[in-house]
């Protein structure tokens, strides 16, 4: 059974991001909800980024001017998302936006929120607990 029409918006969210602020979600829906290319929450990279070799030595400092850290949720029309995730080559795909990018489509970056943390590493739990207890 078809769950959504091709032009219905789908929000894909990581359960690991348990601190999504309502205003960030509203901003994503407002700014990307009418865009055919969809959009994602993201924050500009604030830390200095280093590229290393396989021995762990610095090869270079990467300019962070145009670097963004992707967050979720990510918003796409159902038809586009289905087409992107049905592609034959999903190697290297780390999120829905990268699958859409493989189609030659450039999703919109919508200002995310630093509080939209991802619980990935053990130390993340400490920070998230502090945030949730405030």
Where on the chain are the PLM-derived regions?
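Glycine-rich "substrate-gating" loop/helix at the edge of Rossmann-like oxidoreductase active sites
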Residues: 16, 89, 114-117
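Residue-level signal for alpha-helix termini/capping positions
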Residues: 4, 30-33, 133
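Short beta-strands and strand-loop turn motifs
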Residues: 10-13, 108-111
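Short acidic donor-binding/metal-coordinating loop in glycosyltransferase active sites
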Residues: 7, 13-16, 72
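Conserved core of the sugar-phosphate nucleotidyltransferase
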Residues: 19-110
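Hydrophobic helical membrane-anchoring modules
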Residues: 116-134
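Active-site nucleotide-sugar/metal-binding loop of Leloir-type enzymes
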Residues: 1-9
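Residue-level signal for inorganic ion chemistry
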Residues: 13-14, 44, 77, 121
